[in-house]
Amino acid sequence: MKIREWILAVCCLAGAHATAAAERANVEFLDSGKVLPAGLPFSEAVRVGDVVYLSGQVGIVPGTLKLVPGGIREESRQAMENIRATLEAHGLAMSDLARCTVMLADIGEWTAFNDVYTTFFVGRYPARSAFGAKGLALGARVEVECIAAARD
């Protein structure tokens, strides 16, 4: 390999590395302390450019790892309130949600979840999918994770 070709290859690799590092610099890890207790091994949300990825929320009392009592409806309501609180802590609203994924310990509780979920939106709903899942965190009946479009 000629020296000129070798130098060109090194410069290209250095440029690619610098570009990748700059792209990584746009990742922002968000933790407000308003919903999740400190010390968990994940961020409550991560912003990459104009997209905010929210970690899954279960129906915990904010600041604790204790599920609210009352079953699927109360857990669903609290999970959605936790999503709203997380969004608001980072300057966003429920209307900024683009997609939600719902995991239910018992897919037969879909209707009960949906009755609560629909009260959190006016007119338009995010794209959504749902599935049954065994072994949700903390023994929860429902977990909801969402993706939001950030406003500038």
What are these regions (language model features)?
Residues 3-81, 85-98, 104-152:
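N-terminal presequence-like segments and the immediate start of the first folded domain
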